[in-house]
Design a protein with these regions (language model features):
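Substrate-binding groove/exosite segments of carbohydrate-active enzymes
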Residues: 19-169, 262-269, 273-284
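Mature extracytoplasmic enzyme cores
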Residues: 1, 23-47, 51, 209, ...
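Extended acidic/polar, glycine-enriched regions
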Residues: 1-26
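Catalytic cores of carbohydrate-active enzymes
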Residues: 104-106, 185-201, 208-214, 218-284
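Alpha-helical positions within canonical tetratricopeptide repeat
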Residues: 85, 166-169, 173, 236-239, ...
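Active-site cavity-forming subdomains of large catalytic enzyme subunits
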Residues: 173-181, 185-189
Length: 284
């Protein structure tokens, strides 16, 4: 404790802390003609270290300083050379994947005016494949779909590391996730996926079962990569290749607006099945 330390001890502690901060800030160095741009490496490394709390990344370094499995944190690990942190993060959350039941009923939460699914293990969303917000714990439900971005981070880690043994280890985790996404968010099997509190832009982004461009794109990418990984580890890639192709065709045929040269944000599930022609910046 500080009150029990001498002035000399405190001085040494300060020097150690300052030295560590300086080392961290110099982890990534940019050398460009722009002196303001050159500060970004230190800012990124310092901020990235600030959201690490073993065994996983936090949602924020100041506000929302708590564990949540996705949306941004783990993306920083591999580019900054923290491959060990990346692996620890992904493994701890693989342990948070729900295994049973295999599926469940769709149960809107009446206390939330049907705006959310009931947060209870055993409903459709909180069944096999779902990953809970805290590492190393799979017995509690939480309303986000953070699976979507978490597995995008994991697949990018595989590309960074090329660790075949780790790919084999987490292959069942990936398979359960892809089945969970399909079961919950492409219930009509048309290749377009619904979105439910799935990305960083807002907790409130949901589309009442519609076919959404950005979640469909994430699932296209995940299935495409799963097919490649399957071939590497001796699994059958066919189902993932077929799903990726189905998603790609659905996006092109149902969401592309030729005269505007853009993809629609989403297509309504019910009624006239209208296209919503003003995509969010996250979709562009």
């Amino acid at each position: 404790q500080i009150r029990n330390k001498s002035q000399k001890d405190l001085q040494q502690d300060f020097k150690k802390a300052f030295s560590k901060a300086e080392e961290l800030a110099n982890r990534v160095q940019l050398k460009t003609p722009d002196p303001y741009l050159n500060t970004l490496g230190g800012a990124l490394a310092t901020a990235a270290d600030g959201i690490w709390e073993a065994p996983a990344y936090l949602h924020g370094s100041v506000a929302w300083r708590m564990h949540l499995n996705a949306w941004r944190g783990a993306y920083v690990a591999d580019p900054l050379g923290w491959h060990d942190r990346a692996k620890t993060h992904f493994s701890s959350y693989a342990n948070s994947q729900v295994l049973e039941p295999e599926s469940g009923p769709v149960v809107p939460d009446t206390s939330r005016h049907f705006a959310r699914q009931k947060e209870k293990i055993g409903t459709s969303m909180f069944s096999r494949g779902y990953i809970y917000r805290h590492p190393n714990k799979n017995t509690v439900a939480h309303h986000y779909d953070m699976n979507l971005v978490f597995f995008d981070q994991l697949l990018k880690h595989f590309q960074w590391s090329g660790d075949v043994e780790y790919i084999k280890e987490l292959w069942p985790t990936l398979k359960r996730h892809l089945a969970w996404e399909k079961r919950n968010f492409d219930t009509d099997g048309d290749g377009l996926y619904d979105a439910y509190a799935a990305i960083w832009a807002s907790d409130a982004l949901q589309y009442s079962g519609g076919g959404v461009v950005y979640t469909s794109a994430y699932n296209y990418s995940a299935n495409k990569m799963a097919a490649k990984l399957a071939s590497i580890i001796g699994e059958n890639p066919q189902a993932y290749e077929e799903e990726a192709e189905k998603i790609k065709n659905a996006i092109q045929q149902e969401l592309w607006i030729q005269e505007k040269g853009i993809f629609a944000e989403y297509k309504d599930l019910l009624g006239e099945q209208n296209l919503h022609e003003q995509p969010g910046i996250w979709s562009v």
